[in-house]
Every structure is written in C-alpha cells, then in structure tokens.
C-alpha cells in the first residue's frame, strides 16, 4: 500500500472514527446489523448477515490488536483487545449456547419453514426460520467455521462445539455448503479443533458441491459457483453472474501451505517458523514453496509402503522447528 492509501493502519486509527464499534443501526451494543452480501453464493443460505458481520467485526478488531502489538502501539493494542473482547461477549450472548452449539434466525429459503418475519421501513418483509441443533434446520458450516477460527467460542465450550461443527459436515454427507465468507476458514477451523480427517474428507469429495466436482467435469480454473455447471443435467448456474475463472473458492490453498505442507510463521516475517506437515485421506504426496523475506522456504513429503519421507529448505539466517506427524520435534 502506498503512503496516500487511507486503508493503512495509521490513518485508520488516528481518531478512532474509521473503525466503528458497531453499526449506527445497531440496537444491541457491538452487534453488526448492516446489510451485506454475507456468505455469498452459499448452498444453504442459512448464515444471517448479522451473524457473519459480527464475527468479522471481532476478527477485524483482533487483526488491529495484533498489528498494534507488532508496531509497539500499546494504547491501541489495549483498545482493540478490549473491543475484541466486547464483540466476542456480545456474539456469545446472542448466538452461543451453554452446550457449545450455536443457534440463530436465518432467512427462509424454499426448503425451510416460515416461523417469523420482520418488516423494513420501506414495507418489505423478510421471513425467518430458527436454526438450532437437533432441529430440521441446523446452523451452517460457515457459522461454526467463523466462530471457531476467530476464537469466539469460550475454551470451556470448545470440546462440545467441536462435536456440533463435525456434525455440520457429516449431516451433509461430507459435502460443502459454505460460500465466499466461510470457504477460507472451514479447513483451518476444522484443524484447529483436531478434525483434520474431516477436512481431508471434504478436500477429496467429488460430489457437488465440492472442489473436485469441477475438476472431475473438466475444469482447469476455479468456478465462481459450486454449481456453475451441473454435468448430470447439462445446466448452468445463473448466467447473469457465472464466471468459470473466479478464485474465491480457491482459498483452501492457504490450508495447503499451513497444514498439509505445515509452513507457519513463529516470528514476524518468517525469521523463525514451524514446519509441521500433515497427511490424511488418500493423499500420498505434497510439495510446495514460497519466497519469504529471507528467501525460499519449501516443504515436501511422500508416503510409500508405510514410510514417511520429508524434505525441506530453510533460508539462511532463519530458524525452523520441524514437527513430524509422529510427534517427533527437531
């Protein structure tokens, strides 16, 4: 970013007015109610804007907190830590239950029942249905992915949340329902709570909606929609907005680097970093690299006849800690 770009940290936080604690329309402190695209192009359309917007508000405050820490801005760090905790508390009060599950009202689709409505100032009516565990319309994969990956679930509830999160995948037969907001957080959140096996199952799914469905049907680029083309019926998604080269769902690539290859920074700029490769599902080989400020970091592994072989590149003037899948640390 150049020095005149108003999106840089310094300008955004000079007077505190650029990063609001809540929408002007909010009736509950720290809950975000502004209209937005939400989990765009999701398959189940069940994650309310207010839920995802509040989760992302907390995440934004957390990013600012960490940025302030790196820059040595202690007053800002304190301010954004407090803001994060306040939004987290409001998020939990609104949507996280005592048993670690989440529940909320979501927009009604053609598949859900009408159980409530709200009327806007212009007279338009939005119908809602209640989404909770053990009901026909359970909370979405995105709902759990955001809550877990943004550290919004209290630690004493996380074990139970893990169970409900896993169920959000299994009840859809190991297929995806996430849209643009949930896609980059789904696999990392699953790994965060020890559900790597579920993440690999999603990765290898070939039925629609999945990453490999498009590959199986000849795709060489990432589609905008999970159903940009349905081979079984020979039909296309909404042609008014249906790109066959739209990388949003390719956000799973981050998890390839951080978890399958296992490259994670410990110190800023990868002065020190972790190498903690993972294997799972039917995957027997992985290799990748990127150029850090100190030089090329690479990680490669393969499985053959039950033997795990690993190779890596560590740049000069950096330190890496290697954690192998069997738990050995070097």
Residues covered by each model-derived region:
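Well-ordered alpha-helical scaffold segments within catalytic/enzyme domains
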Residues: 1, 56-74, 143-156, 185-194, ...
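Active-site acid/base region of carbohydrate-active enzymes
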Residues: 1-52, 70-110, 114-144, 156, ...
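Aromatic- and histidine-enriched alpha-helix N-cap/loop-to-helix transition segments
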Residues: 48-59, 138-142, 178-181, 247, ...
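Extracellular polysaccharide-recognition and catalytic grooves
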Residues: 97-98, 109, 135-234, 238-241
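Non-catalytic C-terminal accessory modules of carbohydrate-active enzymes
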Residues: 197-330
């Amino acid at each position: 970013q150049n020095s005149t770009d108003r999106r840089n940290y310094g300008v955004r936080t000079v007077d505190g007015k650029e990063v609001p604690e809540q929408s002007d329309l909010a009736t509950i402190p720290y809950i975000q109610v502004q209209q937005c695209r939400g989990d765009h192009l999701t398959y189940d359309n069940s994650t309310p804007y207010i839920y995802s917007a509040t989760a992302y508000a907390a995440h934004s405050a957390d990013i600012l907190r960490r940025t302030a820490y790196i820059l040595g801005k202690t007053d800002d760090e304190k301010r954004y830590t407090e803001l994060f905790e306040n939004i987290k508390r409001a998020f939990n009060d609104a949507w996280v239950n005592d048993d670690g599950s989440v529940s909320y009202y979501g927009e009604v689709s053609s598949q859900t029942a009408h159980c409530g409505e709200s009327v806007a100032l212009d007279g338009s009516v939005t119908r809602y249905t209640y989404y909770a565990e053990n009901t026909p319309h359970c909370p979405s994969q995105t709902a759990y992915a955001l809550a877990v990956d943004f550290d919004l679930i209290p630690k004493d509830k996380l074990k139970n949340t893990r169970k409900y999160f896993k169920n959000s995948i299994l009840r859809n037969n190991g297929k995806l329902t996430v849209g643009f907001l949930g896609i980059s957080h789904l696999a990392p959140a699953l790994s965060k709570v020890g559900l790597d096996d579920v993440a690999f199952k999603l990765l290898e799914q070939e039925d629609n909606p999945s990453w490999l469905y498009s590959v199986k049907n000849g795709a060489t680029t990432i589609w905008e929609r999970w159903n940009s083309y349905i081979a079984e019926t020979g039909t296309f998604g909404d042609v008014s907005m249906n790109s066959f080269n739209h990388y949003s769902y390719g956000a799973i690539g981050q998890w390839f680097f951080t978890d399958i290859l296992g490259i994670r920074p410990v110190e800023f700029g990868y002065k020190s970093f972790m190498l903690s490769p993972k294997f799972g599902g039917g995957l027997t080989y992985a290799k990748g690299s990127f150029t850090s400020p100190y030089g090329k970091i690479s990680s490669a592994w393969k499985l053959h006849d039950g033997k795990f072989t690993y190779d890596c590149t560590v740049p000069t003037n950096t330190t890496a800690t290697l954690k192998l899948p069997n738990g050995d640390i070097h």
